[in-house]
Amino acid sequence: MDGRQVVRARRWCATAAVALMTASTVAACGSDSGEIVISYYTPANEAATFTAVAQRCNAELGGRFRIEQRSLPREADAQRLQLARRLTGNDRSLDVMALDVVWTAEFAEAGWALPLSEDPAGLAEADATTNTLPGPLETAKWNGELYAAPITTNTQLLWYRADLMDEPPATWDEMLSEAARLHAQGGPSWIAVQGKQYEGLVVWFNTLLESAGGQVLSDDGQRVTLTDTPEHRAATVKALEIIKAVATAPGADPSITQTDENTARLALEQGRAALEVNWPYVLPSLLENAIKGGVGFLPLNENPALRGSINDVGTFAPTDEQFDLALNASKEVFGFARYPGVRPDEPARVTLGGLNLAVASTTRHKAEAFEAVRCLRNEENQRLTSIEGGLPAVRTSLYDDPQFQAKYPQYEIIRDQLINAAVRPATPVYQAMSTRMSATLAPISQIDPERTADELAEQVQQAIDGKGLIP
């Protein structure tokens, strides 16, 4: 998302927070009047956004039922655990769930999420598949059937110091060459990545693997495909070679084995990295910190026209004119581009993130829950979620909307990458598999591509078979 989005989101969410507190206050008594209340569980991080969208739907529903946002923890693992406990405990108050895109298979296989084909109105499948980007839609499927409908999505981009290079690198080989050139000149030479033992490392590996022509599992999620054919093995080894090369390159970040999204963002802002792969929030973060004087190569704090753009709580809250001024100034030293590819002249297949809406199998109000999902992700609410809330849209048509385009300077890249996206392996045991993969990949500086390829295949197979202890 761009800086103007974040600004609008902050202004808007301050108002929406009042609505959120109101919703929490009435939660205990909502059903006492006999009205139907559809619970809507979402991550706490975006509670204000999803509360405001729910209230818009309530205004449209005319009192037939009410959607009530309820917050899950901020961390994905804790969200999953809370939902799993509620579902295994047959919590009948659980209706609509915002699921991380990697949970679809697990929740479907466990019988926790209803297939969209069970919508009594018969509208859920058509709504999910119409005007929805193919990448996000793929994450909502298990065994060829839809169990959820996408509501938000995300994709990583390449961020780079435009004042240090003529053009952004198009491949990882070019990334390494550019970093080597900068190191030889004594300039910033880090490639900022997500290299510590966690899910972000699995995302990086999966993007490289799919971009090299490989994949972790077969499409049905039953067979490990990391080393099963010479072509697949070559793709796995190539992905591992890139990770190892980035970690051990001359002038590389000495703490690269402990890096995540936040350290990557700061490495570029603080002038130590010249190249970074990360999510779209990088741009608004850079502009805000530059206004505060924290970005040495972009001293926006020295521009008198930008005075007053930091509000009383210390966040970037510019006028539209101030935002345009800051954005245009940043273009002289900072840029964004497509995520670097593995093969020359072939675009990367970037692993996507986001949330899907699923109806819980424990719901007592199936028809209303499916109707709530349709309303929460309709085009107007997608516009609000994206432009005001700062969460990338899944509705294809919004990317052709001039208002949307004005708020997302990266919209073309985001759209193109979402159309040709990589998804993380679809399997009910994804959590165990991901944990094993990150443990095998770490520390990335010690990867032996051929040996690590075999170890990865073995660990993924053990996860599929449900054998052994998770590292």
Swiss-Prot record:
Changing R424A: Loss of trehalose-binding. The reported experimental results of this protein may help in designing antitubercular drugs and/or diagnostic tools. Its main location: membrane. InterPro entries: Bact_solute-bd_prot1, SBP. Keywords: Cell inner membrane, Cell membrane, Disulfide bond, Lipoprotein, Membrane, Palmitate, Signal, Sugar transport, Transport. It is found in: Cell inner membrane. A lipid is attached at C29 (S-diacylglycerol cysteine). GO terms for cellular component: ATP-binding cassette (ABC) transporter complex; periplasmic space. Changing W279A: Loss of trehalose-binding. Changing E46D: Increased trehalose-binding. It is a lipid-anchor. Disulfide bonds join C57-C375. Changing N154A: About 100-fold increase in constant dissociation (Kd) value of trehalose compared to wild-type. CDD domains: PBP2_TMBP. Residues 1-28 form the signal peptide. Transmembrane segments: none annotated. Alpha,alpha-trehalose binds at N45, E46, Q79, D100, N154, Y198, W279, Y281, G354, R424. A lipid is attached at C29 (N-palmitoyl cysteine). It holds the Pfam family SBP_bac_1. Part of the ABC transporter complex LpqY-SugA-SugB-SugC, which is highly specific for uptake of trehalose. Involved in the recycling of extracellular trehalose released from trehalose-containing molecules synthesized by M.thermoresistibile. Trehalose uptake is essential for virulence. Belongs to the bacterial solute-binding protein 1 family. Monomer. The complex is composed of two ATP-binding proteins (SugC), two transmembrane proteins (SugA and SugB) and a solute-binding protein (LpqY). This is Trehalose-binding lipoprotein LpqY. It comes from Mycolicibacterium thermoresistibile (strain ATCC 19527 / DSM 44167 / CIP 105390 / JCM 6362 / NCTC 10409 / 316) (Mycobacterium thermoresistibile).
